[in-house]
Amino acid sequence: MGARASVLSGGELDKWEKIRLRPGGKKKYQLKHIVWASRELERFAINPGLLETSEGCRQILGQLQPSLKTGSEEIRSLYNTVATLYCVHQKIEVKDTKEALDKIEEEQNKSKKKAQQTAADTGNSSQVSQNYPIVQNLQGQMVHQPISPRTLNAWVKVVEEKAFSPEVIPMFSALAEGATPQDLNTMLNTVGGHQAAMQMLKETINEEAAEWDRLHPVHAGPIAPGQMREPRGSDIAGTTSTLQEQIGWMTNNPPIPVGEIYKRWIILGLNKIVRMYSPTSILDIRQGPKEPFRDYVDRFYKTLRAEQASQDVKNWMTETLLVQNANPDCKTILKALGPAATLEEMMTACQGVGGPGHKARVLAEAMSQVNSVTVMMQKGNFKNQRKTVKCFNCGKEGHIAKNCRAPRKKGCWKCGREGHQMKDCTERQANFLREDLAFPQGKAREFSSEQTRANSPTSRELRVWGRDNNSPSEAGADRQGTVSFNLPQITLWQRPIVTIKIGGQLKEALLDTGADDTVLEEMNLPGRWKPKMIGGIGGFIKVRQYDQILIEICGHKAIGTVLVGPTPVNIIGRNLLTQLGCTLNFPISPIETVPVKLKPGMDGPKVKQWPLTEEKIKVLIEICTEMEKEGKISKVGPENPYNTPVFAIKKKDSTKWRKLVDFRELNKRTQDFWEVQLGIPHPAGLKKKKSVTVLDVGDAYFSVPLDKDFRKYTAFTIPSINNETPGIRYQYNVLPQGWKGSPAIFQSSMTKILEPFRKQNPDIVIYQYMDDLYVGSDLEIGQHRTKIEELRQHLLRWGFTTPDKKHQKEPPFLWMGYELHPDKWTVQPIMLPEKDSWTVNDIQKLVGKLNWASQIYAGIKVKNLCKLLRGTKALTEVIPLTEEAELELAENREILKEPVHGVYYDPSKDLVAELQKQGQGQWTYQIYQEPFKNLKTGKYARMRGAHTNDVKQLTEAVQKITQESIVIWGKTPKFKLPIQKETWEAWWTEYWQATWIPEWEFVNTPPLVKLWYQLEKDPIVGAETFYVDGAANRETKLGKAGYVTDRGRQKVVSLTDTTNQKTELQAIHLALQDSGLEVNIVTDSQYALGIIQAQPDKSESELVSQIIEQLIKKEKVYLAWVPAHKGIGGNEQVDKLVSAGIRKVLFLDGIDKAQEEHEKYHSNWRAMASDFNLPPVVAKEIVASCDKCQLKGEAMHGQVDCSPGIWQLDCTHLEGKIILVAVHVASGYIEAEVIPAETGQETAYFILKLAGRWPVKTIHTDNGSNFTSTTVKAACWWAGIKQEFGIPYNPQSQGVVESMNNELKKIIGQVRDQAEHLKTAVQMAVFIHNFKRKGGIGGYSAGERIVDIIATDIQTKELQKQITKIQNFRVYYRDSREPLWKGPAKLLWKGEGAVVIQDNSDIKVVPRRKAKIIRDYGKQMAGDDCVASRQDED
């Protein structure tokens, strides 16, 4: 490719080599850049020969420009190079790349304007439509194309998916290309649900608009004819400008790009939002010691996009920070690549760097370079070795701090603290040893920064207990338990290297907890030695072994064996580390804490500790001391006012004790959590796996940190015996057992931790429920166990241990109460107790065991056992077993004698579910894929209503099994049901409440399900017709039931202790008893009709059971319901017959009036039921029979929760006329009027009329020109009304008025034929809506509701004034149990016989005779020795 040098002539080449790559930079363009550019062009399939001319360069730039926004850094570099080359060809003088890009942009703008001018002059009608909302039409006018739904959809999708991550900004910029302010507001409206983000955006836009107004003051005097006014800040934001004005400004000559300006403001706001959602700074992005370079680069660029900086600054960040913040291993490689390395080269070079594998390779290489393996090494061998020097000031290699040109870094170069220089620094290597032990005579120094780091949940650390020959526990005892969090430590983000003193020489050595021995590089040590061979990563090396050698590490001494030989690095091994008391500590967990809050308005628990026995106090002190050492709890002082009781119980079948904290009070006060897992996993859903392991996470909750701000609320106190000393106070640092938030936070944290492992190993199945883990794979057992170890290490890195004790490697596996075998599963063995007498608690436990067993043992029944538990009984109450329950229990014992197993799920086969009827409303089912190999079994015995039939129960059972199958396997089974298709069809077609059931087939398993009787669809010709009715008096409970027939027969019976519903059923029973084999029955009871139409064959009601018996005996029965009895003679007669002396009000009288009212006003059913005292079913029937009310169904009247003074206004159009609608948001009350024109004058007049009738505080409108006019603003100012608009100035939607517009139009449609003019119909519709439709809050009409809201508001304000006055009083009171006066408490309410007070957070009612009310005169009232102050101190 050397031929590419011909691109430039000699003179041009000179110019080329004078142009700088960056403004103010040292590097300049060279020939190699042209060669590189030609190679890159070939990669992109562009002819490199185009570089030789300016026209060719222009074509290349045109090709590359669209890719700049989405392209890589290489494309940007190529574009910059070609742009500079174009300037050299065109003989345009430029000093650097930036100038060249500016010149190119200038030229492009000129050519664009020229092209537009030419197009305008020639009236070019065939112009291709650009992707901008403003285009030129055939007449040459600039018209607006609204932003497309597709664009809006893309914008909503990116916000929902990315949640304001940095990618949102370029996406918004691309989608909003050329948009008008109105389009931009539409885009913001679509994501208006993100209230916090929109509020921030609104503030930014307000600031920018104010700044625009400040920089562009309004010119004095009138605007010249033909000229446009200059836009204000609010015009640019689209609030006070029309679309035509916006188009005018954007297409004017010269143009004012209001769209681009507004877009820039929005992007500024989006930047702030992104910073809020992605708070990490680019300076904080550092590569972890074992983090792959690729992951680090991803994080780096993601954060870089969120930075608010120019492209130049971002380029500089990429060049410097990317390398600078890499870990030491990657940094060495990146520096070796040189400054001009591409990202691709960097990622290739750093592939596989980091972690133990990399360490092994480095050590192997280092050891292979050690040529001399002689036992004795001469000093001369080290003469020419030069150590690389590194500057303390700037951190660069090659010079020392004395010669450094960089500005001097503040403070000490060693420890980073200000106030001293490095030569005076008393710090040792990373404060490695405890100061009070390293320097016993000296004064211990502060460890503030180290302590902070020790408590940090994100650090890994190596910690030392400095001691002589004490054990760690003894040392801890000597220091009175102060060990835990005051230990110095060194984090493992860098290699733990310390300075050691051995044989009078100072050396640097690596602390290696993985090395058994201490190995030092060649040096002379006193005493005898013996030769030895030791194995290293690179093979075996010969060393000299010296025994009893004294080593001093930072002033602390240890004596042990030291090996001397050709090691690439000095290593202090475990033989000396154990003497020093060095421990490798895993912090609690480096995962992020989940923020937790108390419920609004609540404070933490303040429950007193109850007395404990001496034994329990000792146990608790012991447990808490151990927990404190482990960092699970910390001591707190008296400044923490919260407390929760603590106690201890003995563990089951053990002498060990267990600490329990009664968190009931804290649980009441803690926010609610969404339970991450909605149920437990089931073994039938497990796929058969070749290898399986079950793990248990040890101390699960104690491995997850608790939110720091919430810890104070978990405080508890261990009391002392006889109050000898103040109690010891602790608070939790981790998730406590028994606290309501622990399960949800633990499960969420565990899921996050397992996510990367699941992604890396998609073939491994991990079922996670709390601390139980089931891991299955199809790997060979050896590979599987390797993966298990990887998983255990992965969990360990996050602070979760998996104890060997609960690590199950071989089957059967005990998991979640199940027993898992390689090809089958069962429940863990179940033993039913043998008892002579059964208590309520015993039966509850028995039912629980049987329910658990029923998932694999088919045929288990518990209905009769459950009947024993009906009613409220004490747990210890003895219950005799009924004969049925005895029999049921005996059957269950027989079933459980034979062990039954389930098989595992095979995704390639279909699921089949088979149901059998067991009688007495009990059903059993099996789910399988192959016959006789059940996945799981179960039972169903629930009666959803008092009256049911087998078909209905069968449907409910099928739906239960379907739901269960979807949860376990994610699909529905095919059903085999004991019911014939004809029976099912006969019931299903008539019974409208039957819901969907999946695919099924008939299986002839007795007993079959059948319908015992069927109701006729049409009246039976020739059969006697019975008009039945019943009535009861609510007070006396006396009633009558009877019938009248079309053949003149009649009968009435008197009833006692009855209800209206019972009498109606009794009447039907009479009719059935006294009729032949065929009968027509007419009733006015919707209740009775509902029961019988469902064709029940069993019922808990004796009366309904008797009716069922009668129905089964009949050949044909027709049952009808008549809502309006008038006109049906039989019904009128029977009404008079049964209601004599019984009914107080007959609802039938109101039906006619209600129907008349509905024909006029089309009132909804609630209004009619309320006004005419009708039963809801009758009122609904009247609405249902009205053809005009069935067009769009019943309107929903849900209310928006808003303050009483807010109204929404909008204009809607009907029949070519304009209707101005105002809605009172809180009540739904409407004011509407037909206005002659949509002008500011008419709108202002309407608003003033509205303000004269109702208290209007705020009006909320859209950005229509009539609402934004100065006339309306003046009217609002005069009436003291605040005006609000849509986004961005107020994110509240126009939803209420929009829905009311539709509702109003619907009502107008119902009454339009009653009025000649539309304005009359509008007022009729307003009247109907406000006073004839009830529903929503309080069941009122809108008119009643607005009056109620305003009245309540006035009362509340008055009450508030009184409350404010009453709160100035304090109350001293006496409890009934204690003679001492308590207080002072706050007075909340004062009644005739009692007062309501608030003492701390408790609200109490105290009788007046036990309360003294005084005015709050301030603190001086309570003297030092007054009763109140003494009480507080206690």
Curated annotation (Swiss-Prot):
DNA-binding region: 1369-1416
Name of one Pfam family that matches: rve
Positions with a binding annotation for Mg(2+) 2: 1029, 1064, 1084, 1135
InterPro entries: Aspartic_peptidase_AS, DNA/RNA_pol_sf, Gag_p24_C, Integrase-like_N, Integrase_C_dom_sf_retrovir, Integrase_C_retrovir, Integrase_cat-core, Integrase_Zn-bd_dom_N
Motif Nuclear localization signal per record, residues: 26-32
Record-listed Mg(2+) 3 binding positions: 1210, 1262, 1298
Dimerization of protease, as annotated region: 488-492, 536-542, 575-587
A GO molecular-function annotation: exoribonuclease H activity
Regulation of this protein's activity per its record: Protease: The viral protease is inhibited by many synthetic protease inhibitors (PIs), such as amprenavir, atazanavir, indinavir, loprinavir, nelfinavir, ritonavir and saquinavir. Use of protease inhibitors in tritherapy regimens permit more ambitious therapeutic strategies. Reverse transcriptase/ribonuclease H: RT can be inhibited either by nucleoside RT inhibitors (NRTIs) or by non nucleoside RT inhibitors (NNRTIs).
Gene Ontology, cellular component aspect: host cell; host cell nucleus; host cell plasma membrane; host multivesicular body; membrane; viral nucleocapsid; virion membrane
EC numbers: 3.4.23.16, 2.7.7.49, 2.7.7.7, 3.1.26.13
Site (Cleavage) residue list: 132-133, 363-364, 376-377, 431-432, 439-440, 487-488, 586-587, 1026-1027, 1146-1147
Covalently attached lipid (N-myristoyl glycine), positions: 2
Renumbered zinc finger spans (Integrase-type): 1149-1190
Region annotation Dimerization/Multimerization of capsid protein p24: where it falls in the sequence: 277-363
Positions bearing the site annotation: Cis/trans isomerization of proline peptide bond: 221-222
Binding site for Mg(2+) 1: 696, 771-772
Domain Peptidase A2: 507-576
Residue segments, region Interaction with human PPIA/CYPA and NUP153: 189-227
Protein name from the UniProt record: Gag-Pol polyprotein
Source species taxonomy: Viruses, Riboviria, Pararnavirae, Artverviricota, Revtraviricetes
